[in-house]
């Protein structure tokens, strides 16, 4: 190759290098340009793709000391005052491969943890992304104690503040600004998405809200009420994990085939009403390896029953059957649920010594009457979001061990009744997809790989990815009729055993054949 023929290649390489240098230079100088009210820049740094980013300031309970970053990006770390006595820690990740889209991530549990894996996931897909710590650090609810401003940040203000600041920063960093804004969150993040829809209907064009923790105060009470059913691990009413496996196996035996296929997955728990007398030990049985006592059967029946208040009002629907194995070590472990204990101690009663083992349904009434900053997130009139042209896609794992998927069905019904809209009308802006075989936000026994994060990723195509399906809905008007899930052989990144199209509610999946249950085309939404 002659020197003359090399010139075009050298020119191209120089142009690419110049572009890279320009992006890095812009990032290096960006911190000095940020002059926004209440915003205090901690640092700005360029992070090359492939970096394993260390996170020394991440609280130890948040569980992440590092995060692999897949794309070149400019990282902006800030503190933003939300009142005279509160502030959020906020990060904005601006990728080189920017697609003109803004996105906010959410949080989980009671936590004040920036979800760096969601920042990495969405920035890698070309979104300019923000994530905040919800106004406090760590997974405990103790920072709420006698700090109403911190509770307000947690209830709604952290997300909205991050959106306002993030959109301003995008316009400063990218000359083209942004075209559309999106939200992605699960659990508490799902609740935050719906809180944005209800309170700030213009914040997002598209919201992907998974396993939402709305009906929040009653969820807190529902979660702690399991202890009053199971008792401690020395009680006759308590079931060990091994006993819960006996229960689970029997529930699957009775309900698995209702959908037409014996694949170990319950497609529609609305049709599953297990008869637990079948596994009560026979009189004089010398072993309880494959059976439970009558007292334990009553425990299971109560666990799988709706939760009612002091006046008989439904507070929270039943735990859906099929989640027993995942829930046994968390919800039915012979101890009051830790998040609920924290909420009652540090918010409801402002008493760090409150004894969670003494909880009664009267306490649930006190908590609901309090409902600070309307954290319930249970408003069913979302017409302002509809009129603003917003779209919401919500999904919920049918094996969810922390938040009953029946609660998402209940909210869907409330919206339909409040707004006077049937499924066809709701489809214009609100679509709900129950996901069989999915536990809480990820994991499970079935096809849970729907692309709602790094742990469920199976491609960026809209048909395989709920976030990109939302982008296609917002930007091209093509709404998802199903969301495809992947069943991994051993977690994300391992071979895919099969895929399944999860139906849009209120339709449900039925095996029609021909072919094996692993063939997604052998199933039909009815």
UniProtKB/Swiss-Prot annotation:
UniProt feature coiled coil, ranges: none
Domain of life, source organism: Eukaryota
Binding site for Ca(2+): 256, 259, 261, 263, 265
GO MF annotation terms: feruloyl esterase activity; metal ion binding
GO-annotated cellular components: extracellular region
Disulfide pairings: 27-74, 62-113, 186-441, 255-272, 281-291, 503-525
The UniProt record lists the keyword Metal-binding: yes
Catalytic activity of the protein: feruloyl-polysaccharide + H2O = ferulate + polysaccharide
GO biological process terms on file: xylan catabolic process
Keywords: Calcium, Carbohydrate metabolism, Disulfide bond, Glycoprotein, Hydrolase, Metal-binding, Polysaccharide degradation, Secreted, Serine esterase, Signal, Xylan degradation
Annotated protein name in UniProt: Probable feruloyl esterase B-2
Record organism: Neosartorya fischeri (strain ATCC 1020 / DSM 3700 / CBS 544.65 / FGSC A1164 / JCM 1740 / NRRL 181 / WB 181)
Gene this chain is encoded by: faeB-2
